[in-house]
Amino acid sequence: MHELIRLFRLAARMSGVVCLLGLPFSTACTSAYNPLQDFESVSPATELEIPKASAPRAAKYPSEQVTRGKYMVKLLGCGICHTDGALVGEPDYALNMAGSRIGIAYSNPMENKYPGVVYPSNITPDIETGIGSWSESDIVRLLRSGEASHDRQLLAVMPWPTYAWIVDSDALAIAAYLRSLPPVKHQVPENVSTGQRASSPYVHFGFYRSRH
């Protein structure tokens, strides 16, 4: 009997708790040492959801700078390409500067059945479809060098070589004006390479002469 009791006590130490039924003990259950007995149980901390990103607020710039930027944008004719419908004389002012679904062929359609086509981008500060994530320096660099994000060089359909002469104050004013526009969510078609068929309409600018 003593040997049996010793074995049960050993098992109790190993397994934590053993309930002994029908044996002459003062208690029916023997508990092993609980290493957490000196600690107080507490409720878990409340988990907070990560707030969703909100639409970017219009950047604050001096009104004189924004006015100058608006003048420069009109002078350079940015809206002719970057406003939907303007390339065919039917501008949709609800999509002012929000990009064009009508593209511009950059290779001669007289020589290429399927010319390469660029669709002017959304240059409002929309975070998803526009330039909402661009800084002032990003915009100025694009104006002067045609270098977009990720070191991507733009085709000269956008006449950035001509814009290289723009002085700092005017370039920053253009950036201020564009960043102060209301963000417009408007996705334009993807550009197509020469030889690929464009799924959206396009125009072509060029000079031609008669062969006769």
Sequence positions of predicted segments:
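N-terminal secretory signal peptides that target proteins for export/translocation
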Residues: M1-L10
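Sec-dependent N-terminal signal peptides
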Residues: R9-L21
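C-terminal motif of bacterial Sec signal peptides marking the signal peptidase cleavage site
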Residues: F25-A28
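Bacterial signal peptide processing site
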Residues: T30-A32
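Gly/Gly-Pro-rich "capping" loops immediately C-terminal to redox-active cysteine motifs
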Residues: P35-P51, A86-D138, L154-D168, V192-H204
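Electrostatic cytochrome c docking/interface patches
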Residues: P44-K74, V88-G89
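The canonical Cys-X-X-Cys-His
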Residues: G69, L75-G85, I139, I174, ...
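C-terminal capping alpha-helices of c-type cytochrome domains
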Residues: S133-S149, W160-V188
